[in-house]
From Swiss-Prot:
One GO BP: diaminopimelate biosynthetic process
Pathway annotation from the record: Amino-acid biosynthesis; L-lysine biosynthesis via DAP pathway; LL-2,6-diaminopimelate from (S)-tetrahydrodipicolinate (succinylase route): step 1/3
Organism name: Cupriavidus pinatubonensis (strain JMP 134 / LMG 1197)
GO molecular function: 2,3,4,5-tetrahydropyridine-2,6-dicarboxylate N-succinyltransferase activity; nucleotidyltransferase activity
Record text on subunit structure and interactions: Homotrimer.
Family affiliation: Belongs to the transferase hexapeptide repeat family.
Gene field: dapD
InterPro entries, A to Z: DapD_Trfase_Hexpep_rpt_fam, Hexapep, Hexapep_transf_CS, THP_succinylTrfase_dom1, THP_succinylTrfase_N_sf, Trimer_LpxA-like_sf
Catalytic activity as recorded in UniProt: (S)-2,3,4,5-tetrahydrodipicolinate + succinyl-CoA + H2O = (S)-2-succinylamino-6-oxoheptanedioate + CoA
Keyword Transmembrane helix: no
Keywords: Acyltransferase, Amino-acid biosynthesis, Cytoplasm, Diaminopimelate biosynthesis, Lysine biosynthesis, Repeat, Transferase
Protein name stated in the entry: 2,3,4,5-tetrahydropyridine-2,6-dicarboxylate N-succinyltransferase
Length: 275
């Protein structure tokens, strides 16, 4: 079933310029709807960790992108307090109290999640936004005005602080989703975009900006990473001097490494303030 579904999505992607809400064949519509439904239920993911590596299911991402070609904009309501005009319905549009109780997470108004996103048990959505294809795992807090971009993968027991931006894959088009692994803390107003991976047990301080071109400087070793924050890193915003010493450019600085036990026993303030 999955192989046949993947083959149909891959072919539809090749023919995407010819697809529209009026012209798309029924089998393609059904295939895309199937994928979006599985993403919504958490039975299918855009990216999965296999061993130490993350594997991106590109065909699933293609289905998300195709879904925008297959639907017209339509009026929709959210909680009865506002009207919207969009191609993707909200995740909770037709949910009952029993549906929320079974799902086992909290949604604080006016948080919005799009259909095709998955929210696991014991997660909390403060007034925030979770886009289509995103996966938010158990025990994670998405704090006020934080944004989880399309297809982003957020691990267990993560805290996305107020105003955090987790980039998506739709606009601008990205090859791989942003991944925040288990037990990470992302400080207020920080941005993680362009498929950057923040590995488990890491702490990102307030106001840190991470993209594929951002230098991530380890002050203990002098090593520079791109696109990946190593596990257990404590990261703050910083600058590195130019070779001629005339100017400096923004970077992120790994000020220390901590293991899971230290991370659990030490307050965030102590981690960020300590030498």
């Amino acid at each position: 079933m999955t192989q046949a579904l993947q083959a149909l999505i891959d072919q539809a992607w090749e023919d995407r310029t010819s697809l529209s809400p009026k012209s798309a064949p029924a089998d393609i519509r059904e295939a895309v709807a199937n994928v979006i439904g599985q993403l919504d239920a958490g039975t299918l993911r855009v990216a999965e960790k296999q061993g130490k590596d993350w594997i991106v299911n590109q065909w699933v991402k293609k289905a998300v992108l195709l879904s925008f070609r297959l639907e017209d904009n339509a009026p929709m309501s959210a909680g009865g307090f506002a009207q919207f005009y969009d191609k993707v319905p909200t995740k909770f549009a037709n949910w009952s109290g029993d549906d929320f109780a079974k799902a086992g997470f909290r949604v604080v108004p006016p948080a919005v999640a799009r259909r095709g996103s998955f929210i696991a048990k014991n997660a909390v959505l403060m007034p925030s936004y979770v886009n289509i294809g995103a996966y938010v795992d158990e025990g994670t807090m998405v704090d006020t005005w934080a944004t989880v971009g399309s297809c982003a993968q957020i691990g267990k027991n993560v805290h996305l602080s107020g105003g955090v931006g987790i980039g998506g894959v739709l606009e601008p088009l990205q090859a791989n989703p942003v991944i925040i692994e288990d037990n990470c803390f992302i400080g207020a107003r920080s941005e993680v975009v362009e498929g950057v991976i923040v590995e488990e047990n890491s702490v990102i301080s307030m106001g840190v900006y991470l993209g594929q071109s951002t230098k991530i400087y380890d002050r203990e070793t002098g090593e520079i990473h791109y696109g990946r924050v190593p596990a257990g890193s404590v990261v703050v915003a910083g600058n590195l001097p130019s070779k001629d010493g005339k100017y400096s450019l923004y970077c992120a600085v790994i000020v220390k490494k901590v293991d899971a036990q230290t991370r659990a026993k030490t307050s965030l303030n102590d981690l960020l303030r300590g030498d």
